[in-house]
Amino acid sequence: MPLVCLADFKAHAQKQLSKTSWDFIEGEADDGITYSENIAAFKRIRLRPRYLRDMSKVDTRTTIQGQEISAPICISPTAFHSIAWPDGEKSTARAAQEANICYVISSYASYSLEDIVAAAPEGFRWFQLYMKSDWDFNKQMVQRAEALGFKALVITIDTPVLGNRRRDKRNQLNLEANILLKDLRALKEEKPTQSVPVSFPKASFCWNDLSLLQSITRLPIILKGILTKEDAELAMKHNVQGIVVSNHGGRQLDEVSASIDALREVVAAVKGKIEVYMDGGVRTGTDVLKALALGARCIFLGRPILWGLACKGEDGVKEVLDILTAELHRCMTLSGCQSVAEISPDLIQFSRL
């Protein structure tokens, strides 16, 4: 039976993976309230289509940070893709390159940045970085990303400590130990004779540290994890180039706002001065359309990419991207939007249910 929607890929992926691997991918923090709300919140939004327009040509292309992508559907940073498929991030990168969309590669990828870039040398990529206490480490990672042609840095800000992920605890999966081991291996590759202290993301990283980061790179800096107007305003004050509205897929602090709900607050705060993106809960083309109508420049996919990877490797990731893009194209056509630029808040209303 063909897999025709993202829900099909989810169901099939679960059958392909061990319970521990599946729980790591799907795991949520605490009671999973935010995890569920990310999806449910989209369903409280209704569409207001316009008809009797010439819809013979519909274009899903847009730009992020000045670079064109085929659709406003990109790939979020998620760790350890080899859990889902042996080639891991290399397969993901090849699929993203073929689709002509942005792939944000995680600090905790299964393969080195060099190996991933070699697998898809023409791909459009950003690098996600967890800031560490060791600034030599931070600078080294930034320099590697610059040398490899990454176009932006994505700084995840919502992880001063890991969320309480009960599934991983029940499975006795020590994620923090795995992350520390990954750091140590990466540093030993660069400095094999030097003993380097390794730490989990720096809990004390704060707004004032952004200036130090900006002093060591010319790449645009995108902050991932903002959920409030106050932090959005501070982000602009500190001259970042973009924001990803995100609650880490409901894996960090439970009972925070769904990403699509927080998006409205953040977009209103930035007033179009910097680009705003979002991730969390996107499962259909209508979800993408709603996020764009509320002001997102593009959406990023996390778990669905891993579902595709678990099902069919590179081909599965490409199918997930193709399905969502086709759904968006159809939804735009049925809503009267010839281009992404025509998608506006007038397209939506909020259900009273």
From Swiss-Prot:
Regulation: Is inhibited in vitro by CCPST (4-carboxy-5-(4-chlorophenyl)sulfanyl-1,2,3-thiadiazole).
An example molecular function term from Gene Ontology annotations: identical protein binding
Phosphoserine: residues carrying this PTM: 133
Catalytic activity reported: a (2S)-2-hydroxycarboxylate + O2 = a 2-oxocarboxylate + H2O2; 2-hydroxyoctanoate + O2 = 2-oxooctanoate + H2O2; 2-hydroxyhexadecanoate + O2 = 2-oxohexadecanoate + H2O2; 2-hydroxyhexanoate + O2 = 2-oxohexanoate + H2O2
Compartments it resides in: Peroxisome
Catalytic EC class: oxidoreductase
Residues annotated for FMN binding in this entry: 77-79, 106, 128, 156, 224, 279-283, 302-303
Co-factor remark: Binds 1 FMN per subunit.
Cofactor: FMN
Protein's name according to its UniProt entry: 2-Hydroxyacid oxidase 2
Organism per entry: Rattus norvegicus (Rat)
Gene that this polypeptide is encoded by: Hao2
